[in-house]
Amino acid sequence: MSQANPTQPGLLRRIVSSLLLLPFLLAVIYPFLWMVFGIFKTNHEFYQPLRLWPMKPLDTGYWSGIADTFFPNEFSLQTFRDLLALKLVPFWDVFGNSLMVSLGQALGAVALSAMAGYAFARFQFRGKRVLFVLAIALILIPRQLFAWPLFSWANTLGLSDSLFGVILPGVVTGLGVIYFTQVFRQLPDEYLQAARVCGAPELRVFLTMLPLVWPALLSYGMIHFILAWHEHLVPMYMLTTESQKTLPLALTKLYDVSQSVSQGAQMAASTFALIPTAVLFAVCYRKFKSSLSEML
């Protein structure tokens, strides 16, 4: 009598789960595929309507019409040349500005939030609860309410229309303080006691703890980089010179002049804007997942 293969039920479940998730996967990736293929389309092709079902039950030209609507007639790099040749938007300059702002905010926010979280988790001091409530308030209060005070503050310090004036407000984050407070609370006390027995100063103890929480550092750095990369409000208030603006502001201007800029060039700019965050998430996904699982 043959024995049933114990792996068959599990394999069947995976197949059924994959089939059930396939429509959701297609719904998620369709906008990205549409954007990428839109790079190579002319404006006439771009605005062709997409029919999701045939007008007639036996319409033999339906599938060819779907292909003609979804795929470009010709794959050409002309749209990339149009984008990079635009005088209205210095694309590589604003791309570099966004990269500098996002990296600066991510590194600064990780450093400042980690130190604040360590202090909240391991020390008792006067006003601790009040400061922690303020950190929560930074999350709950809409950022729009801080826009004008931040602009006035930067103007007073001479930081308006500078990338540093955009980076500096972004390193202060209530979410990071709460996140790292929880991270350092989960560390065993034995590590801290061992470091303090050796007579190390508190800063040295803190630096000793950092390798133990480096997945959390990497995860939060990734989150903050992505948030800073897509930030629109603060750069809009702070930056006025075209060469100082960030990528979201340039994309906004690019779409505002859609009559003179091809839709393919707009899709190319949007695709370029997506690449850094997509690559960062793909590289850091496993560490991000393990950090969240340890925290929860």
Language-model features and meaning:
Residues 4-296:
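A structural signal for multi-pass alpha-helical bundles of membrane permease subunits
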